[in-house]
Design a protein with these regions (language model features):
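Non-catalytic, conserved peripheral segments adjacent to functional cores
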Residues: 1-106, 126-127, 137-188
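Conserved metal-binding segment of the jelly-roll/cupin
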Residues: 103-125
Length: 188
């Protein structure tokens, strides 16, 4: 596994080797000990999810206010997507900053999203499937969203007709969530 830190400290892109022969391919896409060794970040998954999306589906921006926070390991296993990670930690020097990463099923790439960050993605193909490994279990009462179309975030999504859930389409702005004290806090 090769790891590179992206433009926001603590956000990592991991590339794993894909081995193949006449039978198909094999990929070890996450190993906690290797990730810790390369990043000094302890990530132990407690839940795994799959998400299937049609082309132009925009999901997010989602985040958790779980007591211990929630980090994610995101991997595309079919199709391709434009993945967005945004720092939502009030008081962080990178608050509101975001990075985009294109994930493709045949790339061997995954993204690590630390606690206190939001996540969204745009499916670039039909039959796009991503996996999420989560550091804490899903708890609906602690899950929140911010509009991925909030103009104050200056997110340059591709110019397409998005397919969105009503929940994401009507999600509040970053400023609204901040004023409501519904954002994670930065901890040194």
């Amino acid at each position: 596994m090769k790891i590179s830190e992206l433009d926001i400290p603590g956000v990592f892109k991991a590339t794993s080797r894909i081995d193949g022969d006449h039978r198909g391919t094999f990929r070890e896409w996450f190993k906690a000990s290797s990730f810790f060794e390369l990043t000094n970040t302890n990530f132990i998954p407690t839940q795994a999810n799959l998400s299937f999306s049609s082309k132009n589906t925009l999901r997010g921006i989602h985040y958790s206010l779980a007591t211990d926070g929630q980090s994610k390991w995101v991997t595309c296993v079919s199709g391709s997507l434009l993945d967005l990670v945004i720092d939502l930690r009030v008081g962080s020097p990178t608050f509101g900053n975001h990075v985009f990463v294109t994930l493709e099923s045949n790339s061997g790439d995954s993204i690590y999203i630390p606690k206190g960050f939001g996540h969204a993605f745009l499916a670039l193909e039909d039959h796009t499937c991503i996996t999420y490994l989560l550091s804490s279990e899903y708890e609906p009462t602690l899950e929140y969203e911010i509009s991925p179309l909030d103009s104050s975030l200056k997110i340059n999504w591709p110019n397409v007709d998005f397919i969105m859930s009503d929940k994401d389409l009507n999600a509040p702005s970053l400023e609204s969530q901040k004023v409501s004290n519904l954002l994670p806090k930065f901890r040194d």
